[in-house]
Amino acid sequence: MEFVFLGTGAGVPSKGRNVSAIALQLLEERGQTWLFDCGEATQHQILHTSVRPRRIEKIFITHLHGDHIFGLPGLLGSRSFQGGTTPLTVYGPKGIKQFIEVALSVSTTHVKYPLEIVEITEEGTVFEDNEFHVETKRLSHGIECFGYRIIEKDIQGALLVDKLLEMGVKPGPLFKRLKDGEVVELENGTILNGKDFIGPPQKGRVITILGDTRYCEASRELAQDADVLVHEATFAAEDEQQAYDYFHSTSKQAASIALQANAKRLILTHISSRYQGDTYKELLKEARELFSNTEIATDLKSFPVDR
């Protein structure tokens, strides 16, 4: 599992930062990539990374401001042009379906893969399978905006091979049956319960990715005990009132959410273009005064998510 930040700026592109898009690489977990937001030129940013459009399985949109969605039509079309055939699902607030369908229709763009668009109308679970569970809550922004909590389900423990070998059980079909938790009988009449030969499960990881938001309780709830919290930090602490007026957060407020939620790690993004060059490091300094395990994303930077 790895983050690739494709765009980390706020509002409009700047020389140093493109607008919002984050790829969550789940190559080891499911051989796919999930994308969170898709600002303009996202597909161009992808060209500079290991992200492959054909592997994008899901796109989660936080809200419908242009800096978070204007890259969608181009990416969806290019994925088809480049030979993508596997299904893709886009999740987002009400209106995302109309935006995509009109853009593709007017531009006569035809996608050759199954494209499903899911409009989120209620908080709660938006996706779940045997590996992951994705929950959402409304944040505090000028328009409807969602934050996402991605929960990796616990992974079954490894088969205790050494223990079986000590008992004289040879590798083969019995190993698979025992790993599946079956009760088996050996040739000598010994009964083995597969559950007794499975190590402890690996705890799944929790990732929280928030859209644009003021400091709010929903952010803390989504980030509770997260392994990684990705939070916007549009403004410095001295501009807290301006952040409030424009429905955004300061770096210090992001750190406060991480601290209250007992998150393990904080990554700041959505940085205003007023912080050019190394001036953005002041945002990092302010956040670390409150929450030491803070990093700030820059375009094309990757962050592995360890177990």
From Swiss-Prot:
- Keyword Metal-binding included in the entry's annotation: yes
- Entry's cofactor comment: Binds 2 Zn(2+) ions.
Q: Which Gene3D superfamilies match?
A: Ribonuclease Z/Hydroxyacylglutathione hydrolase-like
InterPro entries in the cross-refs: Metallo-B-lactamas, RibonucZ/Hydroxyglut_hydro, RNase_Z/BN
This protein's record includes keyword Hydrolase: yes
Q: Name one GO molecular function term.
A: zinc ion binding
Instruction: List the active site.
Output: D67
Binding-site positions, Zn(2+) 1: H63, H65, H141, D212
Instruction: Give the record's keywords alphabetically.
Output: Endonuclease, Hydrolase, Metal-binding, Nuclease, tRNA processing, Zinc
For this protein, the Enzyme Commission number is: 3.1.26.11
Description of how the protein assembles with itself and partners:
Homodimer.
Q: What does this protein do?
A: Zinc phosphodiesterase, which displays some tRNA 3'-processing endonuclease activity. Probably involved in tRNA maturation, by removing a 3'-trailer from precursor tRNA.
Which family does the record assign? Belongs to the RNase Z family.
**Which PANTHER family does this one have?**
ZINC PHOSPHODIESTERASE ELAC PROTEIN 1
Q: Give the matching NCBIfam families.
A: PRK00055.1-1 (NF000800), PRK00055.1-3 (NF000801), RNase_Z (TIGR02651)
User: This protein is called what?
Assistant: Ribonuclease Z
Which gene specifies this protein's sequence? rnz
